[in-house]
A protein has these predicted regions:
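Hydrophobic/basic alpha-helical segments enriched in Actinobacteria
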Residues: 9-10, 32, 80, 91-93
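Absolute protein N-terminus
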Residues: 1-2, 102
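Glycine-rich beta-strand-turn "strand-cap" elements at beta-sheet edges
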Residues: 39-57, 82-102
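Short amphipathic alpha-helical segments
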Residues: 14-40, 78-84
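Short, well-ordered beta-strand segments in beta-rich or mixed alpha/beta enzyme
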Residues: 2-9, 39-75
Length: 102
């Protein structure tokens, strides 16, 4: 099993627009072979001082994939290519952390 923690930083004020595009492809992603979890997340509003916030222009994606081949196929899926095309001018950076259980 492979886990992904992806951190996406949108241009100032554009996070909601990027999230809308991400939400639109989420059903197709969840239907992909090997996808166990695909969850878009943002900061909990009022957790308190222990929280390290991502920030107002940032969201993350928590993903679980059966194996590396499934994750690679996800990256090349037509809906992901379309997502990248739609958001290329709205995103400042993406940090994709590919993780395995310790």
């Amino acid at each position: 099993m492979i886990r992904v923690f992806a951190v996406i930083t949108a241009k100032p004020g554009k996070r909601d627009e990027v999230l809308a595009a991400a939400r639109a492809v989420t059903p197709a992603v969840r239907a992909e072979q090997g996808c166990g979890e695909y969850q878009l997340v943002v900061d909990e509003a009022d957790f308190g001082p222990a929280q390290a916030k991502l920030g107002p222009d940032v969201y993350a994606v928590i993903e679980t994939w059966s194996d590396a081949d499934a994750l690679r196929a996800h990256g090349g899926a037509p809906h992901m290519k379309e997502f990248r095309r739609q958001t290329k001018d709205l995103i400042v950076s993406s940090a994709i952390h590919v993780l395995t259980p310790a």
